[in-house]
Amino acid sequence: MTGMESPRDIRARIARSQWTKPTTGLAPAYAQANVVILDRRYAFDFLLFCVRNSKPCPILEVLEPGVTEPHATAPGADIRTDVPLYRVWRKGRLEQEATDITGCFDAGMVSFLLGCSFTFEASLTGAGVPVRNIEEGKNVSMYVTNRKCASAGPFSAPLVVTMRPIPNDLVMRAVRITSRYSLAHGAPIQVGDPGALGIRDLDRPDFGDPVTVKDGETPVFWACGVTSSLAVLSAEPELCITHAPGHMFITDVLNETLAAL
């Protein structure tokens, strides 16, 4: 794919299983979203979890039970087919990965779209801040931390973060740029000290791929929407569906419409 393709065109390819890889760098001008789909019985408590933990779980859209089209963020899209790779969970255990969840989706399911840090990557690169996972053609590095989120009903989780190595002299620029995107996790939660988050080895992420951290660079950590997936697993619902880490839903929402002045 090229960066010139529209979100609609990319989603069409994804729906045909022509793209099943991570979405970092795709449609760089448009916001991407984490996906959580679960039974309506759990929807309010999960919504409350997101509200209480808005840094890792900023809400872009919530679909009514049984609705498959995200009318606000991607009219005409289908939440059942337009994610490159889904994970299907039964009682907290991974049952399968799939590129189409039409057979699992029923009229009682509520879909949540939550902000993603891929949204601000184009602004970083546009300002001369390198994004290593894009440079190396990898998924972003994600780590489970020692910080606990506020619980809600059966939902609880440790905070998950992404890490991007930033040249030392560009760290403040990266902080300023990303702080404008509160619906894409906003400013970093930690700069330069993985140990403070309980991260022992940057070369061993819990999700995604390891990336190169060069001399003269600082590891910078942002809250991550995979936190929401861990929260859902903690509740052990009979069935829930999430995106596979790094395989996001691409919306029609321009990044800049999510940015503060």
Swiss-Prot record:
The Gene Ontology terms for molecular function here are:
lyase activity
What EC number(s) does its UniProt record assign?
Answer: 4.2.1.-
Q: Span of the secretion signal?
A: none
**A Pfam family:** D-Glu_cyclase
Domain of life assignment: Bacteria
NCBIfam families, sorted: PRK05463.1
As for family, the record states: Belongs to the D-glutamate cyclase family.
User: What protein name is recorded for this chain?
Assistant: Putative hydro-lyase Sfum_3393
**Source organism:** Syntrophobacter fumaroxidans (strain DSM 10017 / MPOB)
Instruction: Give the classification, highest ranks.
Output: Bacteria, Pseudomonadati, Thermodesulfobacteriota, Syntrophobacteria, Syntrophobacterales
